[in-house]
Amino acid sequence: MAAPVNNPDHGFCRDCLTFQRSETRRCERCGSPRLARHPELYRLHLAHIDCDAFYAAIEKRDNPALKDKPLIIGGGKRGVVSTACYIARIRGVRSAMPMFKALEACPEAVVIPPNMEKYVRVGREVRAMMQTLTPLVEPLSIDEAFLDFAGTERLHGQPPAVVLARFALAVEKEIGITVSAGLSYCKFLAKIASDFRKPRGFSVIGEAEAVGFLATKPVTMIWGVGKAFNATLERDGIRTIGQLQTMERGDLMRRYGVMGDRLYRLSRGEDVRRVDPDQDAKSVSAETTFDTDIASLDELVSVLRGLSEKVSARLKKSGIAGRTVVLKLKTQDFKLRTRNRQLGDPTRLADRIFQAGVELLRKETDGTKFRLLGIGVSDLSDDDKADPPDLVDVQSRKRAMAEGAIDALRDKFGRKAVETGYTFGRGRDAHPPEPLED
């Protein structure tokens, strides 16, 4: 590539990566309109990368017949949308939307149940490519991460902006999906930038423009401002970030506590958090939505066992364990219940997760009908100290040994090769876990 012209307003082409020598609308070399230009383009080094409609993009990659069709990843009329391709989104389909509403908005959509094993595998391929660019990669989920390119220009021989654009092209060519990237000076604004112009987006928010850019945006753009807190701010007459910019830190903290300090800082584009490559997931869980609401403890216990095994499998695959078991229930009128129990030591065993879940579940089965059941673990750590041998509880030790034998058989012959008495014959009235993906 030609040596860069010292004028970031000219920018470079995102398709052929050629630096531009004038402010043309199309690339001087290949004619592409996808030009990256910004006064701070070559000074910024903090990026957020987000795969575009990740689950749906993988399914379309693997089945070209789906390319021009609206696609929803989800399952069952009583479930929710995990994600939807951009064609379906144009028709009004959104993540977390109930499936029946999604199909009302887009009745011609193709619906595919989520295949998490495949998505995790592709996510790891993308992550591995990120880690060749910089050691400072902080995953947020299987399809997005922060990257800090500070100090890498000598390594790559190019400014971070160009490395980022080259990465996007490489993912598209080598993995067959697209990504959108945001480049800024802090995490908060890099994340916002990556949401612009999806799919295949590349957006830049510089430090000089940050306050003015944020002023007109709704307060919901600030992390932590959800529906409930937004309602509180609206009652106080605060709707835009610009209104927050006129307020004193002390006033905001008196009104909203610790959150007031966040409102003050982020409204001014102040975010000093560093990219942390050691940032870990905070929990591992699985849940399912029933076709028919269930009140029976026996039926719920049967489903709980299968979910516990899914959580256990993910923990073992990741080499981690959790100390707190969390039960999640949603009633037929959509009220959410969460209960938790802390264990004496971390676990990755399905049996221990299941037993703790059953104890929590018994206290909730009072005739109430449930439409959703979930189980998970939090307080995660490496699994080297998980599940020490219980010399007192012989049965517990035997169950752990049996679980190890079952795992070995499933690794060799597949997950359905061995079923427990709890899970045998299940699956006719429940959908698999449906994790959400933006």
From Swiss-Prot:
Signal peptide: none annotated. The active site is at E144. Residues 46-226 form the UmuC domain. It is an enzyme of class 2 (transferase). GO terms for cellular component: cytosol. GO terms for biological process: DNA-templated DNA replication; error-prone translesion synthesis; SOS response. InterPro entries: DNA/RNA_pol_sf, DNA_pol_Y-fam_lit_finger_sf, DNA_pol_Y-fam_little_finger, DNA_polymerase-Y, DNApol_IV, IMS_HHH_1, Rev_trsase/Diguanyl_cyclase, UmuC. Keywords: Cytoplasm, DNA damage, DNA repair, DNA replication, DNA-binding, DNA-directed DNA polymerase, Magnesium, Metal-binding, Mutator protein, Nucleotidyltransferase, Transferase. One of its GO terms (molecular function) is damaged DNA binding. Its main location: cytoplasm. Its EC number is 2.7.7.7. It catalyses: DNA(n) + a 2'-deoxyribonucleoside 5'-triphosphate = DNA(n+1) + diphosphate. It comes from the Bacteria. Pfam families: IMS, IMS_C, IMS_HHH_1. Binds 2 magnesium ions per subunit. Mg(2+) binds at D50, D143. SUPFAM superfamilies: DNA/RNA polymerases, Lesion bypass DNA polymerase (Y-family), little finger domain. Gene3D superfamilies: 3.30.70.270, 3.40.1170.60, 5' to 3' exonuclease, C-terminal subdomain (1.10.150.20), DNA polymerase, Y-family, little finger domain (3.30.1490.100). Monomer. Poorly processive, error-prone DNA polymerase involved in untargeted mutagenesis. Copies undamaged DNA at stalled replication forks, which arise in vivo from mismatched or misaligned primer ends. These misaligned primers can be extended by PolIV. Exhibits no 3'-5' exonuclease (proofreading) activity. May be involved in translesional synthesis, in conjunction with the beta clamp from PolIII. Belongs to the DNA polymerase type-Y family. This is DNA polymerase IV 1.
